Amino acid sequence: MRFFALFIYRPVATILIAAAITLCGILGFRLLPVAPLPQVDFPVIMVSASLPGASPETMASSVATPLERSLGRIAGVNEMTSSSSLGSTRIILEFNFDRDINGAARDVQAAINAAQSLLPGGMPSRPTYRKANPSDAPIMILTLTSESWSQGKLYDFASTQLAQTIAQIDGVGDIDVGGSSLPAVRVGLNPQALFNQGVSLDEVREAIDSANVRRPQGAIEDSVHRWQIQTNDELKTAAEYQPLIIHYNNGAAVRLGDVASVTDSVQDVRNAGMTNAKPAILLMIRKLPEANIIQTVDGIRAKLPELRAMIPAAIDLQIAQDRSPTIRASLQEVEETLAISVALVILVVFLFLRSGRATLIPAVAVPVSLIGTFAAMYLCGFSLNNLSLMALTIATGFVVDDAIVVLENIARHLEAGMKPLQAALQGTREVGFTVISMSLSLVAVFLPLLLMGGLPGRLLREFAVTLSVAIGISLVVSLTLTPMMCGWMLKSSKPRTQPRKRGVGRLLVALQQGYGTSLKWVLNHTRLVGVVFLGTVALNIWLYIAIPKTFFPEQDTGVLMGGIQADQSISFQAMRGKLQDFMKIIRDDPAVNNVTGFTGGSRVNSGMMFITLKPRGERKETAQQIIDRLRVKLAKEPGARLFLMAVQDIRVGGRQANASYQYTLLSDSLAALREWEPKIRKALSALPQLADVNSDQQDNGAEMNLIYDRDTMSRLGIDVQAANSLLNNAFGQRQISTIYQPMNQYKVVMEVDPRYSQDISALEKMFVINRDGKAIPLSYFAQWRPANAPLSVNHQGLSAASTIAFNLPTGTSLSQATEAINRTMTQLGVPSTVRGSFSGTAQVFQQTMNSQLILIVAAIATVYIVLGILYESYVHPLTILSTLPSAGVGALLALELFNAPFSLIALIGIMLLIGIVKKNAIMMVDFALEAQRSGGLTPAQAIFQACLLRFRPIMMTTLAALFGALPLVLSGGDGSELRQPLGITIVGGLVMSQLLTLYTTPVVYLFFDRLRLRFSRKNSKPVVEI
């Protein structure tokens, strides 16, 4: 009593406290970063190693395996995957959430150092690592085009100057430069000319390497001067290499230009990049795992004027893709939804109270509670994102509830003629415990979420804390500011036997009278209501089992990503043509704004594309509808497939799969994996629940197998090393020397001129100089035949792995797809030597599914414990919790009606309903217990009177929560796919709960009261008179 009086009778202090909360909130709002979702990126480090010319199997066994054994000893590694292709190996390490990325990077470097002695010689550089996830979509793509500069020169400028400058920006984690490679001097050998001159390829390589050296020459000095010695020991351009003498034939000098074409070119000619049909160099920028995407993009954009000022006029620098506009638009939509929710809630209050002054009180309480929450969000290190702003939107209906309960009870005393200050004090005292019970039990719902681990726990933590803080501030405001404003702003009215009612008031009176009549009938037919109650419990179980489920709603971020997978024997020239064809098909779609893509490198038959769609306001279709439309056109392209998927704000795992979801096959036997993977992939491709089924197992690449006749080689004086060196020199794009320039280092690359290596006959032109100096053709001691060979070898842990990726057809949920895959694996009878499991997002979905029911039960148990403590009763909490089944039925039916799968967002809605709908029962039970204690009423009379007396605040609080969530259901535009499931769940649950709990709660109350009396009689002892 004294606590409430302290704030009611000291209005200045109360107002200043509320103002302080508001000012702190405004300051916190201005300092909060902006993001699409809470920070849920796993710490990921990518290790790269190269050995030019080595086959995928050689890279896997000699490079990947030693590194994996060393890296696998690092603490906190969630998953380790590797992919080895022609000349390169990439290992992805995904760490636990609580692992510091910088500490992990130090451990990775130590592991690389430990494995160094086990790696093969001839590697051009030590393995390197980068703190970035290559499977993440770039946050920004910059393109460089030029009419006069070559692609190699553009690539050099981009990688040497632009990438270095951008990498220094806070938040930038990794920059992939694609579309070409660094400049190089390329030596294209003529095998016939070499044979005629008797010059071996090793001799050419050694002559070039010896002619281009960089060694210190020292200095000369006398008593006065010092001279640094400098020589022309370096050759830097193709023109300087052409006259180089590599051999003497009968006294005549054989120069490099006589036996080879020497050109200024690039290190790897098998690379191509394009933007909107123009050749381009792409800078694909990814953020650090812990970085904020908006702040990072803003930092890059702020640097762009400086970057444009430093580039030559012949280069055009453009932004081809930027993730931030759709993120900002989505957050703006949420902010508008929040404003609409606040307005609707205030309108509900006004319609019920029909007083401007009375409406002003919750109109002040709501913004103070919401704005004050921003201060706590800042202190907790949160961000303004879709989930935290959705929490505030939902909180609108919650925070007004406390104010409504207090305000309505005070208004009831004022209508009875009590003086304002007395009414404020008395009304607050009566409902103070009720308000505290409602708020604490609501906060209790979120305690299990705060203890939840993994990605779902990280994702929901900000939502739970934000909502809990808003409820806590609302509780303080409703017990301090609200009664103070009621006492000083509202006026008492003369009691009337039949007060005048207009509009909504008349409707409310009619509803209350009708409710009273129907409630009397219900209390006389309790068994029927009990059957209905048990029916809702059973229906909950059935609906939860039957409803389609997914991990997270499919987002439309306005960006698509596509992976190209062509025939495994395709040439680079043909692959570049496929890239152009696919880009034309996509560019012609009316919903597409920009297309960039690249191909080449170690995997000639693959490529990547990034598509920026027009803003949502300029297109009618969703991203998924656009993909469905393009899929039909793209399927007509022979010899290659392009798999499109919408870029999501959440992507789990480090695999660069060509679809959104993955199923990984593991085996200790590579042969067993290669036997069963095609069978499993074929079976999964036939499932209607899956689309775009593809695999990263590529073991049908064209290979030319050379079989050495070792006896003949020994007789001819040739060793295997010389033969292998011949092949590497001829066909491996061998980097044989380094050219040092002020800004970078470039390579001299040697191979047979492409004019002489167009077919298998090129092998017939190869020869080796034996120990006697004679030229021995390769065909003398080797035979060759075509065969199939893998284009890549993949590992997970230390096991051979193959990942089957898939998308979902429109109208199919992830649960339906996973069930179909598990069923198919069982039907196929896959042996125990091949193990299958979901990975990436599908794996997290499986883990979340296993914990959903536990989470809901834990939330209900927590609420029960809190209510039991508050009421000092085992029974009354059960009465209050009896409101939950009807809410669950309403939520699940609403999701079915809107064809929305049960996702993590819908789970949040269910958790919220646990907190919302019990408020009705709390208000009923509190007044019924008070009526029994102080009024001497029977349980039936008490609960009947409580239901009628609390009918108006129950309607007000329910409608406030309903109208607070309604804008989420009706919202469109960017990010609506996240907001709508939450709104649908809450609105559906509230409507069904309101219809049923007004009748089931009093029946359950009476049932438990009779049960209590029955047990009390059994346990009572007879009184013995003395």
From Swiss-Prot:
For the keyword Transmembrane helix, the answer is: yes
Record localization: Cell inner membrane
- Transmembrane regions listed in the UniProt entry: 15-35, 333-353, 360-380, 387-407, 431-451, 463-483, 528-548, 853-873, 897-917, 953-973, 984-1004
Q: Which domain of life is it from?
A: Bacteria
Task: Cite a single Pfam family from the UniProt record.
Answer: ACR_tran
The family database entries (InterPro entries) matched by this protein are listed as: AcrB_DN_DC_subdom, Acrflvin-R, Multidrug-R_MdtC
Keyword list (alphabetical) reads: Cell inner membrane, Cell membrane, Membrane, Transmembrane, Transmembrane helix, Transport
Q: Which GO terms describe its molecular function?
A: xenobiotic transmembrane transporter activity
Any one GO CC term of the record: plasma membrane
What family classification does the UniProt entry report for this protein? Belongs to the resistance-nodulation-cell division (RND) (TC 2.A.6) family. MdtC subfamily.
What PANTHER family does the record point to? MULTIDRUG RESISTANCE PROTEIN MDTC, PTHR32063
Q: How does it assemble?
A: Part of a tripartite efflux system composed of MdtA, MdtB and MdtC. MdtC forms a heteromultimer with MdtB.
**Name of the molecule in the record:** Multidrug resistance protein MdtC
Supply the source organism for this entry: Salmonella gallinarum (strain 287/91 / NCTC 13346)
